[in-house]
Design a protein with these regions (language model features):
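Short, small-residue-biased leader/transition segments that mark boundaries at the very start
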Residues: 1-7
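N-terminal targeting leaders that direct proteins to extracytoplasmic destinations
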Residues: 8-16
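Secondary-structure boundary elements
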Residues: 17-111
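A structural signal for well-ordered alpha-helical segments within the folded catalytic domains
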Residues: 73, 111-122
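Short His-Asn-centered micro-motif
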Residues: 109-113, 134-136
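Hydrophobic/aromatic-rich core segments of domains that either
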Residues: 118-190
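Low-complexity, Gly/Ser/Thr/Pro-rich intrinsically disordered linker/tail segments
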Residues: 189-280
Length: 280
């Protein structure tokens, strides 16, 4: 991929309008009308499903006994390696980590990026991290978007970009880990972003910064969306299931169009969307 191919994609992202940090209420779709910005919630690691997940895969030993960042990365590597990525696979009925790992082994198959990010999200929640799976969307959806994770580091007091499909995280030129909002902003401002050396697809194809960040993710960072409730079995449909509400962070002058049953809210306020999970 030449820079010539990436330029129009980066240009679209760079031409997006900015955010509005003074906005105090979201744009509401469906019947979910509210005058206040809704709260993000994170499932407690003592939830019985998360406790079972932690024990089932012995996540404590997978995370290891190093510092917080090493645990975050070890869980990323584990999900990247435990199932293959297959972007064309049909989504399983039961969308939780235990069920999906078993299904992939049994049927010798993979899952798509959305399922991989939900698995990593459950593992982070089970290990006591605040985490979300984030759908990264292009300005115009033609055939592809991408789903990754934002996990909150207490030691760095910020959200971090973790992508289980590509075993990927991003730093600045000094090696400081970056979050999704920071990567987007740096791409918009032509500031340096660095992809980890071992970023890859299915342990076969090495990923480059030029393709993965300047082209693929520049395309997919026009707006981002996630459920307000970060939980186990987030998108498994079962009797009595309360479907999560989704919120999109969109640039001013743009609308996600509140897809029925999915996006309930749009916000232009990035400091709200990326607020600390410990913020009162």
């Amino acid at each position: 991929l030449s820079l010539h191919d990436a330029l129009p994609i980066l240009y679209i992202l760079q031409q997006a309008e900015g955010y509005n940090r003074t906005e105090t209420k979201p744009i509401c779709y469906n019947e979910s009308v509210t005058d206040t910005l809704p709260r993000f919630t994170y499932m407690n690691p003592n939830d019985s499903n998360l406790v079972q997940l932690r024990k089932h895969f012995n996540l404590d030993s997978i995370a290891g006994s190093g510092d917080e960042i090493s645990k975050i990365k070890n869980l990323l590597y584990w999900v990247h390696n435990i199932v293959p990525h297959d972007g064309n696979s049909r989504n399983p009925e039961e969308r939780n980590t235990i069920a999906m790992v078993e299904l992939c082994k049994k049927e010798n198959r993979g899952v798509n990026c959305r399922m991989m990010a939900q698995m990593l999200n459950e593992c982070y929640l089970a290990m006591g991290f605040k985490s979300r799976f984030i759908t990264c969307m292009p300005k115009v959806m033609i055939n592809d978007c991408h789903v990754i994770n934002a996990v909150y580091s207490n030691t760095l007091d910020k959200w971090l970009w973790m992508d289980p499909t590509f075993n990927a995280y991003v730093t600045d030129e000094k090696g400081n880990l970056l979050g999704i909002g920071e990567v987007r902003e740096r791409l918009r401002n032509n500031q340096p972003v660095v992809l980890n050396e071992d970023a890859n697809w299915n342990n076969k194809n090495k990923q480059t910064k030029e393709y993965y960040l300047d082209y693929y993710m520049a395309k997919n960072l026009y707006y981002v969306t996630c459920p307000l409730q970060s939980e186990y079995n987030a998108e498994t449909n079962y009797p009595g299931k309360k479907w999560p509400m989704y919120i999109s962070l969109v640039p001013e002058g743009y609308s996600s169009n509140g897809k029925p049953g999915a996006t309930a809210y749009d916000s232009h306020n990035d400091s709200y969307f990326w607020q600390s999970p410990y913020q009162e």
